């Protein structure tokens, strides 16, 4: 009889301890969630990129206006610089798209392997390999 009373008491103490621990954990999680600085949204980042690109193009145009048409090489240098900048940006976008595509393929393959409720056997989604191409080497 003593053991049954002791077990109830221990069970209540353990449940109270777990409840307090869960409450503290939840409060700490909320605290750290709201204390962390907010990440900039993709819309704001896109606007910043477009603004910086416009400034860069304006600066190149003004630089070309300031150079008198003594020689055609100055305007071609600005054009080549702009072309290189665009090539670097496109290469970065391509690399990010390849990474994103690989992540999506990984999720699709793992999701279809885990979903066996439809009765089909085997993996119907083809596993893609790394499709990364070196674009920066081909653009000059």
Curated annotation (Swiss-Prot):
Main location as per UniProt? secreted
Glycosylated residues are 110, 134
Give the signal sequence positions: 1-26
* Entry keywords, A to Z: Glycoprotein, Secreted, Signal
Is Secreted a UniProt keyword of this protein?
yes
Q: Name one GO cellular component term.
A: extracellular region
Which Pfam families does its entry note? MGT5A_N (PF15027)
The annotated region (Disordered) lies at: 120-140
Q: Which top-level group of life is the source organism from?
A: Eukaryota
Q: Does this UniProt record's set of keywords contain Ligase?
A: no
InterPro entries from the entry?
CCDC126, MGT5A-like_N
Q: Where in the cell is it found?
A: Secreted
The name of this protein is Coiled-coil domain-containing protein 126
Organism of origin is: Homo sapiens (Human)
